[in-house]
Amino acid sequence: MSELKQAAAPEQALVVGRITSVYGVKGWVKLYSHTEPMQGIFDYKHWWLKTPSGWKTVELSQGRLQGRGLVASVKGYTDRDQVKDICGMDVYIDAAELPELEEGDYYWSQLEGLRVITKEGVLLGKVSQLMETGANDVIVVRACEGSFDREERLIPYAPGTYVLNIDLEQQEMVVDWDPEF
C-alpha cells in the first residue's frame, strides 16, 4: 500500500523537480531535479504532489545519483506498479524550507514573473523563465500587457552589466537593454 496522503497545499508551493519514470522493480523512480546541485532535491524529505484529486504528500526514503541522473525511493512504495501512479508528477516543496540567501542573491523562482523594465523606463515584458547556458544564465522575457512590443527577448543574467536592479517588493527588474534589440 502506498503512502500518498491527502494534504493541504504548501504555503508557497515551489517546483523542485519531476518524477519522470519507474526505475527497477522495487518501487524506485527516476527524477529530474531543478535544484543546483541536482542532488539538492534530496535535502527535502517531504514532497508535495499535485494530483487530480488535490495535494498529496510523500516522504523521501532514499535518493542517489545513478549514471547522469537521479533515482529515489519513496516511503511506502515497494513495487513498480505502485509508483506508476506518481510518474509524470512535479515535486513541490514549501518555499519556506529553502535556505536563506545572501543579499543580492535570488532563487530563480523569485525572478519569474517580474516585470522587466529598461533603465529608461520602457516595459519589455515579464520574466517567463531562466535558462542555464554555458557562459551566462539567460532571462527569457515575454511580452505582457503594456509592453513595448510583442517580442520575446533573451537577456543575459549578468548583474551589474545587463541586470541593474531587482526589486522583489515592486516585482520589477531594471535592465540595461535596447528595446529595439
Swiss-Prot record:
- State where the protein is found: Cytoplasm
Q: Where is the signal peptide?
A: none
Relate the assembly described in the record.
Binds ribosomal protein uS19.
Q: Which NCBIfam families match?
A: 16S_RimM (TIGR02273)
Q: Which InterPro entries match?
A: PRC-brl_dom, PRC_barrel-like_sf, RimM, RimM_N, RimM_N_sf, Transl_B-barrel_sf
Q: Which residues form the PRC barrel domain?
A: 103-181
Quote the cellular component terms of the Gene Ontology held in the record: cytoplasm; ribosome
Q: Which GO terms describe its molecular function?
A: ribosome binding
The record's listing under HAMAP family reads: Ribosome_mat_RimM
Q: What does this protein do?
A: An accessory protein needed during the final step in the assembly of 30S ribosomal subunit, possibly for assembly of the head region. Essential for efficient processing of 16S rRNA. May be needed both before and after RbfA during the maturation of 16S rRNA. It has affinity for free ribosomal 30S subunits but not for 70S ribosomes.
The name on file for this protein is: Ribosome maturation factor RimM
How does the entry describe the domains? The PRC barrel domain binds ribosomal protein uS19.
Which Gene Ontology biological process is one annotated for this entry? rRNA processing
Tell me the gene name: rimM
Which family does the UniProt entry place this protein in?
Belongs to the RimM family.
Q: Tell me which SUPFAM superfamilies the record gives.
A: PRC-barrel domain, Translation proteins
What's the source species for this entry? Marinomonas sp. (strain MWYL1)
* UniProt keywords, alphabetically: Chaperone, Cytoplasm, Ribosome biogenesis, rRNA processing
Lineage top rank: taxon: Bacteria
